Amino acid sequence: MPILSLHNMHDKVLILDFGSQVTQLIARRVREAHVYCEIHPNDVSDAFVREFAPKAIILSGSHASTYEDQDLRAPQAVWDLGVPVLGICYGMFAMTVQQGGKVEASAHREFGYAEVRAHGHTRLLDSIEDFRTPEGHGMLKVWMSHGDKVTEMPPGFKLMASTPSCPIAGMADEARGYYAVQFHPEVTHTVQGRALLERFVLEIAGAKPDWIMRDHIEEAVKSIREQVGDEEVILGLSGGVDSSVAAALIHRAIGDQLTCVFVDHGLLRLNEGQMVLDMFEGRLHAKVVHVDASEQFLGHLTGVTDPEAKRKIIGREFVEVFQAEAKTLTNAKWLAQGTIYPDVIESGGAKTKKATTIKSHHNVGGLPETLGLKLLEPLRDLFKDEVRELGVALGLPPEMVYRHPFPGPGLGVRILGEVKREYADLLRRADAIFIEELRGTKATAQDAVAGLCTEDQVGKSWYDLTSQAFAVFLPVKSVGVMGDGRTYDYVVALRAVQTTDFMTAHWAHLPYALLGRVSNRIINEVRGINRVVYDVSGKPPATIEWE
């Protein structure tokens, strides 16, 4: 079912993307206010904008320059609809130019933290401030990222905010509901950013906060039943959050018309295969076909050391194994995938040349055409946090729904260099010990005093306080001593990060006692490993995964 028809019952916000790296964060903030929104390229047609029928429109930032990129404009329908419009950074420039103002290159570029002074009284910034100056001026702590600046506001606009180097850092035409800010309210660095966006969406635009996951189940189930009818569906079940929630939702809708295919490529976490089977066969009573293809995958990975080559091999072999199994299910007419909204956005970005590939993503793209199947993607409108919320509402256990992210190629990209069964077995056990200790260790008041956590985090497990944690197998040996003998065994690295969006991440400051206990257990319980190191790299410059 087209997205527009499924969500016509909700008030919607349209976000037009000019190529910013943080446009997704705008959508997440709007969704967190329980208002449905979608991201679309800035060059959509006027007809699309009118058909979307938004309650409000937000124009994103961009790396581009307004006066150099004349094609980066909002459709005319944006200004003709009569709904509130918020321009952010480049979106402010687009609004300025299209409404008759002027934008020029700034002699002083601003990248990073800044303090913005609010001017006058506007609905958007009324009572929203971080502190006041001795003179009584309301101030906001914000994040700036721009090289141009507005030098002349369009007719009808008034000054809303400024900095010493950016005299027009915010402007408003309140009669038409047009607002623009030079800073980025969507990023966490802008302290009052969430309040600003909620003010715009809920109060100025009057959107109803009715985007609730438990209510979405009923809508999604109805949509799936209408799409599928009495036809059968197959789904590649990986054990990850997305495919698990997709399977649970589809099974809720059509029951035994769904067959899940679980491919074990030999690179799963410890006991992961059995856990998936117990959940979907035992608890949900879903049909699951278990395929052990570990020999095939590991065989094709022999001698391969390049990370990108490993990803492509694992993706190719998954397609072949899944395709062979799918052909035995002759009644299947649909292929279901756990595609989520960031995947959709990034694919669109790639098509418009607004995204750059850092690593190949392991998925089953291409299967629908190869198999002649129709594609069913029930999660394609949802962000990861919404998928987790939906999973809990569907009855999946929290320990499955809130598991840390696991790459599609599995341990294949957590074993540096060549992948061997021996390495995978060692890594599986080391990783399980690390995760077990993280789950079993709670943050203490002493940890809070030491600055390792906040007071409100005391009592939570360190697994829940980290966004992603795992072990990495290093294909090098080091000398050690155990008992009276010399050892010459492998090394594993532990990686744990904390992040809100996975675009940037800080390495997790875990208690030394916890790290020491993990190291001691791995060295004593996993024969073949005699050294454990901890990764203290942030993102950037490092990525979260090592490969």
From Swiss-Prot:
Instruction: Please list the residue ranges annotated as the GMPS ATP-PPase domain.
Output: 211-403
Q: What is its EC number?
A: 6.3.5.2
- SUPFAM superfamilies the record matches: Adenine nucleotide alpha hydrolases-like (SSF52402), Class I glutamine amidotransferase-like (SSF52317), GMP synthetase C-terminal dimerisation domain (SSF54810)
| Residues of the signal peptide | none
GO molecular function list:
ATP binding; GMP synthase activity
Q: Which pathway does this chain act in?
A: Purine metabolism; GMP biosynthesis; GMP from XMP (L-Gln route): step 1/1
Q: Which residues form the active site?
A: C89 (nucleophile), H184, E186
Gene3D superfamilies, sorted: 3.30.300.10, 3.40.50.880, HUPs
Matches recorded under Pfam families: GATase, GMP_synt_C, NAD_synthase
Q: Which PANTHER family match?
A: GMP SYNTHASE [GLUTAMINE-HYDROLYZING], GMP SYNTHASE-RELATED
Q: What this chain does, per the record?
A: Catalyzes the synthesis of GMP from XMP.
Self-association state and partner proteins as the record states: Homodimer.
Q: Any idea what this protein is called?
A: GMP synthase [glutamine-hydrolyzing]
Gene (UniProt)? guaA
